[in-house]
């Protein structure tokens, strides 16, 4: 009985200190960058909750003798439900798994059209560019109201082609744009907003990795 009470107290203490860290937001546009970091450096960078870019990411996704830079749209589509390829994805991304992971999801997509505003509600969200270059517009959580998000965390604004007279709050929006090149990975912080855009009319191959820990799944707002 005493042991059970002791364990409950320990768990409560851990949760108490984890809660503010899990829900802490960093609104700065400062960017951290590192070349192929070791696990310790990687985790320390993500714990700062800033935009983080990692270069020279060693992703090996050759499948049936085809390298990612030669994946076509149709071929990429056939990989969506391919268990063998999913295993390859998981093996490549195991290194970036959050400690005490209880949820993870991978997806590979052939990117050919710019996206609308996307609200990032996962605790750890990694985006890897496998081919060419992609442009990413990033908005911190404070910009949410100015971007006309609704209660479902969605916005119907076409930001780069919007009518600023119809949506006057857009005049106050602050954001940055970055270029993510081949074999580079970005960590988009929790509750940030982003848009993916083609760069110089290039199609890209994107790999996303979503991860939640026991604590983030339980405690995040």
Regions found by a protein language model. Give the residues of each.
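N-terminal accessory scaffold of Fe(II)-dependent oxygenases
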Residues: 1-186, 195-221
């Amino acid at each position: 009985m005493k042991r059970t009470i002791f364990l409950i107290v320990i768990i409560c203490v851990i949760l108490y200190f984890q809660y503010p860290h899990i829900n802490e937001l960093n609104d700065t546009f400062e960017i951290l960058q590192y070349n192929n970091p070791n696990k310790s450096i990687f985790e320390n960078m993500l714990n700062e909750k800033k935009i983080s870019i990692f270069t020279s990411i060693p992703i090996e996704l050759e499948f049936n003798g085809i390298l990612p830079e030669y994946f076509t749209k149709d071929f990429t589509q056939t990989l969506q439900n391919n268990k063998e390829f999913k295993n390859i994805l998981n093996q490549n991304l195991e290194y970036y798994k959050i400690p005490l992971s209880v949820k993870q999801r991978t997806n590979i997509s052939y990117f050919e059209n710019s996206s609308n505003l996307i609200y990032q509600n996962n605790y750890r969200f990694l985006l890897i560019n496998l081919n060419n270059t992609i442009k990413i517009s990033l908005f911190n959580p404070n910009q949410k109201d100015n971007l006309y998000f609704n209660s479902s965390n969605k916005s119907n604004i076409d930001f780069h082609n919007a009518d600023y007279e119809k949506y006057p709050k857009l005049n106050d929006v602050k954001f940055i744009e970055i270029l993510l090149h081949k074999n580079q990975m970005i960590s988009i912080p929790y509750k940030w907003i982003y848009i993916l855009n083609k760069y110089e009319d290039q199609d890209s191959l994107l790999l996303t990795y979503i991860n939640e820990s026991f604590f983030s799944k339980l405690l995040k707002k």
